[in-house]
From Swiss-Prot:
Belongs to the UDP-glycosyltransferase family. This is Erythritol-mannosyl-transferase 1. It is found in: Vacuole membrane. Residues 366-387 are annotated as: Disordered. The gene is EMT1. It is an enzyme of class 2 (transferase). InterPro entries: UDP-glycosyltransferase (IPR050271). The lineage of its organism: Eukaryota, Fungi, Dikarya, Basidiomycota, Ustilaginomycotina.
Length: 615
């Protein structure tokens, strides 16, 4: 059967569909991705990773071009980053996400009709579209074909709010108290007012109703970042890549299936966590040994992975690693990088050299206020930069080095001068990785080649991230305690959920990155009774996430809907043949009865799939 997958090519949206496609092609189905041109290379890489020509031949790419309505919105988000980063409860963060996704009336019309025409040409047995890609969603609705949607964001965005006590997606108070009800009322009023005053939203609502002939989902629903898509007459269900039960938004539509993290069926994703086996073996190792040599291959490698090798060395030295990754959209400022370094230098010293940091540092490829081409390199020269760099480069030391060297490292962190491209980049870190080679307690990386190897490494103890849906749910899947430095929109909800369900801690200063907050929170996560309780809770929720099925469950749900739609087409074809025969032999007297017996609706598909999913 043929399945069409649609999403904006931003990694947060497309990654779960890649995992789902991995499963669908192994079930024998053909998968066609419909997205922007920038995803072409990723599709080619995805094909080559299959190492099987039969599987690779089942992967297809339908290029939707490079128009703003179908291309990666990551750069657009980064251009609004300073306004986007707001504390919990601030509606403007959600509004900026909405504004970045908005396009003009003509751009919206062109994108939706192109998607409709392309899908009708492909004739898929089932369509699955990312709920955060409104232009693509509209094209799917216009086909009249059965379709599904995928949700890679927080649970409250799909929840039905029937009373003021049901938390608003941007709500800071989520305990169903009088104060939370007042906050929800305020946020709902702001949302309604802002939706009514945006001309592009008004034009989009008019297009949906008057030109496209699509049914309304309500005033705020038609304008929402995640509309109530299950209300569309051809929608047969949704797939939520979140763990069942790990939510405070309890009124979820029955058409939506929670499948946990978007993790594939690869056995490497589901075996015993390496750190548990390693801890058990370490207890059995001779007490006289100063280093522990694993009795099993630490990690399978297809090539050198310098990040993993660095973690191997830390583990052999009895050190613990914290992994810091703020996602592909986040850009660090120089002050924030320094705050992190000072915090982890303190942790390193307080632990006697036992705590180290793996730091994924994004580098701005374009100027923050411009989505055009990259700016030419124009580093600023500093008279004492070379001397400061020599201080950093020459400061590597073994565990237990003198306090004098430690003080020099601290001075190097405070004084290091960043290399910048242009003044337009002011405020965003342009550090070169070589500047940190002397800091023994931290390793910087621009790109993680195999994040699974990081998550499963026996040295890893805590993950720090921004609260993105994929980051949060992958940490849950791998039973990793997490610290969430939430930054915008629904990341605050994930931070609140982590703390409420006892699987992590959140920053009390979000979205600011504070040195003392990092030190205090990491100390709580790495040692003591609270840390042990969080580790136990993380293991329990890991089981619940794995039981939900992940990408294999998503693929089976799509397959079930495709099979039902295929049966519908066969029934309709058989009915038309019978109708033609009846017309020839005895007129049309019994055709109406025949049509009523063979009629099939998307609602029946949705109900049937719910039965399949619950078996």
């Amino acid at each position: 059967m043929k399945v069409a997958l649609l999403a904006n090519p931003a990694r947060g949206e497309i990654n779960v569909l890649l995992a789902t496609a991995y499963e669908l092609i192994r079930l024998g189905h053909d998968v066609t991705f419909l997205t922007g041109s920038s995803f072409a290379n990723a599709i080619a890489e995805f094909r080559s990773e299959q190492n099987d020509p039969i599987l690779a031949a089942r992967i297809h790419f339908s290029d939707l071009g490079n128009a703003r309505a179908v291309e990666d919105f990551t750069r657009g988000m980064q251009s609004h980053l300073k306004g986007l980063r707001k504390p919990p409860g601030d509606y403007s963060s959600m509004e900026i996400c909405q504004i970045v996704a908005l396009v003009t009336e003509q751009e919206f019309r062109d994108a939706a009709t192109m998607v409709r025409d392309r899908l009708l040409e492909i004739e898929p047995d089932m369509i699955a579209v990312d709920a955060l890609s409104p232009n693509l969603v509209t094209g799917c609705r216009m086909t009249g074909l059965p379709w599904m949607f995928t949700v890679p964001c927080s649970p409250s965005l799909t929840a039905t709010r029937k009373s003021l006590f049901d938390p608003h997606p941007m709500g800071r108070r989520r305990q169903r108290t009088l104060m939370s009800a007042l906050e929800n009322l305020k946020l709902t009023f702001i949302e309604t007012y802002r939706n009514a005053t945006k001309k592009d939203l008004y034009a989009r609502r008019a297009l949906l109703k008057n030109e496209f002939g699509l049914n309304s989902m309500g005033f705020n629903g038609d304008s929402a970042i995640v509309p109530p898509l299950w209300k569309d007459r051809n929608c047969v269900g949704g797939i939520h890549f979140n763990t069942p039960g790990l939510t405070d938004s309890i009124r979820q539509p029955h058409q939506i299936h929670f499948v946990g993290a978007g993790v594939t069926s690869d056995p490497e994703n589901h075996d015993t966590p390496v750190f548990e086996a390693a801890s058990f073996l370490k207890q059995l190792s001779p007490s006289s040994s100063t280093t522990f040599k694993p009795l099993f291959p630490p990690l399978s490698k297809t090539g050198r992975d310098l990040d993993v090798e660095w973690m191997d060395e830390a583990y052999a030295a009895g050190q613990l690693v914290v992994y810091l990754n703020m996602g592909s959209m986040f850009l660090w400022t120089d002050a924030e990088v320094r705050s992190c370094l000072r915090a982890f230098e303190r942790l390193y010293e307080q632990s006697g050299g036992k705590i180290k940091l793996l730091f994924k540092l994004n580098k701005p490829k374009r100027t923050p206020n411009n989505t055009g081409a990259s700016t030419p390199t124009a580093p600023i020269s500093s008279p004492d930069f070379e001397e400061k760099q020599r201080t950093v480069m020459g400061s590597a030391r073994p565990v237990g080095a003198s306090n004098l060297v430690s003080e020099k490292l601290a001075d190097a962190i405070k004084n290091v001068t960043p290399r910048r491209k242009t003044d337009a980049d002011k405020g965003y870190s342009q550090f070169t990785l070589s500047e940190f080679e002397g800091l023994e307690y931290v390793r910087f990386t621009r790109w993680v080649h195999d994040q699974r190897s990081i998550y499963k490494h026996p040295a890893l103890r805590v993950v720090i991230h921004h609260g993105g849906g994929n980051s949060f749910n992958e940490a849950v899947h791998y039973a990793l305690p997490q610290m969430i430095l939430s930054q915008w929109f629904d990341t605050h909800e994930y931070a609140i959920l982590a703390e409420r369900f006892g699987i992590g801690l959140r920053s009390k200063h979000a979205p600011k990155i504070d040195e003392n907050d990092l030190v205090n929170t990491m100390t709580r996560l790495l040692q003591g009774p609270e840390a042990e309780k969080i580790r136990r809770n993380a293991k329990v929720w890991s089981i619940r996430s794995r039981n939900a099925g992940g990408a294999p469950a998503a693929a089976r749900l799509i397959e079930a809907q495709a099979m039902l739609f295929n049966q519908q087409k066969q029934l309709e074809l058989a009915a038309s043949e019978v109708r033609a025969a009846v017309d020839t032999l005895s007129g049309k007297s019994s055709v109406a009865d025949l049509e009523s017996e063979t009629a099939f609706t998307p609602n029946m598909l949705s109900g049937a799939a719910s039965t399949v999913g619950s078996d």
